[in-house]
């Protein structure tokens, strides 16, 4: 997704930059990756799972979002040092706004969920976390405790039962990438003041977002998140102000094509 989004924009800006995809498989020499990032022809790098926590630790300086979440999705080269940012936190903050949540139910406990938890700091009275991997849930609970957030782990079924009374539902899993998937919380109706935040982006409208639309609820989907995530990079990289508009136009064109499916 990132080369498709950024390269048309960079060509229009005529600043001499290009966006390349690097495949960094699990088990690769991360010291070699870090050394490559410090080469003088590198401006910055987006980092995807499963390397977001590595990126936070590999940086010389970090933002508050990285320090709090323990994850980074953007490394910027500043001379011979790396500066870590978490634009997932920025995107969730922008899209969620200043809502106060009485109860947030989060499906998934990976990097996207960590960013969401940081963005909700001070704005959620209670959080329920459900993940197929108990260890991932445990790690997210530790983060919640460090932030002073009242959180509990639940089984998938328990979280689905709690969802109808929640004010925020977060899908930080791949559920929805298939057009045959159900909403992440099941088929139940949600509270009239609920918001649905779905990290999945796809050519089709995901089941979770379709249900939110049918119920007249506020929502943010994976395309919204991609837009805000990219917009957050613009000032960090010192790019021209018109970059944001170019990104939005390019993302709109990609959304209208068969751009595949993904989760941030």
Place the predicted regions along the sequence by residue:
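Phosphate/diphosphate ligand-binding glycine-rich loop within oxidoreductases
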Residues: 1-99, 203-205
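Residues at the starts of beta-strands that form the adenosine-phosphate
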Residues: 18, 102-103, 125-128, 150, ...
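The conserved SAM/SAH-binding core of class I Rossmann-like methyltransferase domains
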Residues: 22, 130-132, 197
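Glycine-rich adenosine-cofactor-binding loop
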Residues: 86-89, 96-121, 131-136
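NAD(P)-binding Rossmann-fold cofactor-contacting core
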Residues: 124-147
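Rossmann-like adenosine-cofactor binding region
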Residues: 147-220
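Adenosine-phosphate binding glycine-rich loop
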Residues: 195, 199-264
């Amino acid at each position: 997704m990132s080369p498709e989004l950024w390269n048309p924009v960079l060509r229009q800006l005529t600043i001499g930059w290009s966006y390349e995809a690097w495949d960094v498989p699990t088990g690769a020499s991360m010291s070699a990756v870090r050394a490559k990032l410090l080469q003088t022809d590198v401006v910055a790098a987006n980092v995807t799972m499963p390397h977001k926590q590595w990126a936070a630790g590999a940086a010389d300086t970090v933002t508050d979002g990285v320090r709090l979440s323990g994850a980074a999705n953007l490394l910027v080269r500043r001379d011979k040092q790396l500066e870590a940012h978490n634009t997932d936190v920025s995107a969730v903050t922008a899209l969620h706004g200043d809502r106060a949540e009485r109860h947030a139910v989060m499906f998934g406990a990976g990097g996207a969920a960590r960013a969401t938890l940081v963005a909700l700091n001070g704005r959620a009275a209670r959080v329920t976390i459900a993940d197929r991997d108990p260890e991932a849930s445990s790690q997210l609970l530790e983060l919640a405790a460090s932030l002073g957030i009242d959180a509990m782990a639940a089984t998938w079924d328990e979280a689905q039962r709690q969802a109808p009374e929640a004010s925020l539902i977060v899908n930080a899993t791949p559920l929805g990438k298939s057009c045959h998937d159900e909403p992440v919380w099941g088929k139940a109706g949600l509270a009239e003041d609920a918001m649905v935040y779905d990290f999945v982006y796809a050519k089709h409208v995901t089941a979770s977002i379709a249900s939110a639309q049918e119920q007249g609820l506020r929502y943010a989907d994976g395309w919204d998140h991609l837009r805000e995530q990219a917009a957050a990079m613009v000032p960090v990289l010192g790019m021209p102000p018109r970059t944001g508009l170019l990104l939005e136009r390019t993302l709109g064109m990609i959304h209208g094509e068969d751009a595949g499916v993904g989760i941030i």
